[in-house]
C-alpha cells in the first residue's frame, strides 16, 4: 500500500511542471476578463504590450453573421492557455494590475504568448497615449498578421481597438 502511495505521488508530481524561478504557470481555469487579461486568486494580470479586441464590439463573419470581436479574442486566448500551458513573469504592477510576459510551449519550442495572439490575428499591438506601440516587435507582428489577413483581419469591418479607445477618450469630458 505504501508503495502505491509513493508511486502515485511520483506520477502526480511528475505530470505538473513547476515554473522556473521568477515565473508562474498560467493555468486553465483562470477567470479570463478578455483576450489579454485575467484574474487568478484575486490578483489581476495583463499580457504586456497586447490589446485584445474589445468585448461588445462586433464584426461580420464570412457568412454575414454579427460576432463579438472581444469574445473571439477571449476564445483564442483560452485555447492557447489550454493547449500550450504558458509560463509567465511579472514585469510591472500598475494600478493593481500585474503586467506579464508569457511564453508558451509548442512542441520543443518556447514562443512568446503575446506574439502568438497577435500573429494569429486575434489580438493587436497595444499603443501608448502618443500612438507608439509598447512593443515595436508586436507592431511588426500585427502588420504581418494584417497583410496575411490572419484571424480577425480577414473580416473587412474589424477595427483596431486603439481607434475605438481613442474615439471614446476624445468624447469623454476632461476633468480639471
Sequence positions of predicted segments:
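Sec-dependent signal peptide recognition
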Residues: 1-7
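N-terminal signal peptide c-region/cleavage motif recognized by signal peptidases
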Residues: 13-15
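Small beta-barrel nucleic-acid-binding modules, primarily SNase/OB-fold domains
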Residues: 17-176
Amino acid at each position: 500500500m505504501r508503495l502505491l502511495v509513493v508511486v502515485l505521488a511520483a506520477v502526480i508530481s511528475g505530470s505538473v511542471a513547476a515554473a522556473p524561478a521568477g515565473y508562474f504557470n498560467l493555468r486553465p481555469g483562470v477567470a479570463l476578463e478578455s483576450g489579454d487579461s485575467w484574474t487568478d486568486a484575486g490578483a489581476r494580470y495583463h499580457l504586456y504590450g497586447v490589446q485584445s479586441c474589445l468585448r461588445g464590439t462586433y464584426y461580420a463573419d464570412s457568412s454575414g453573421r454579427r460576432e463579438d470581436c472581444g469574445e473571439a479574442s477571449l476564445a483564442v486566448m483560452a485555447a492557447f492557455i489550454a493547449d500550450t500551458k504558458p509560463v509567465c513573469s511579472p514585469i510591472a504592477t500598475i494600478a493593481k494590475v500585474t503586467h506579464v510576459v508569457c511564453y508558451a510551449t509548442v512542441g520543443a519550442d518556447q514562443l512568446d504568448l503575446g506574439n502568438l495572439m497577435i500573429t494569429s490575428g486575434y489580438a493587436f499591438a497595444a499603443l501608448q497615449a502618443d500612438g507608439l506601440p509598447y512593443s515595436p516587435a508586436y507592431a511588426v507582428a500585427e502588420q504581418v498578421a494584417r497583410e496575411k489577413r490572419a484571424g480577425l483581419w480577414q473580416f473587412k469591418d474589424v477595427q483596431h481597438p486603439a481607434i475605438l479607445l481613442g474615439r471614446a477618450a476624445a468624447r469623454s469630458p476632461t476633468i480639471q
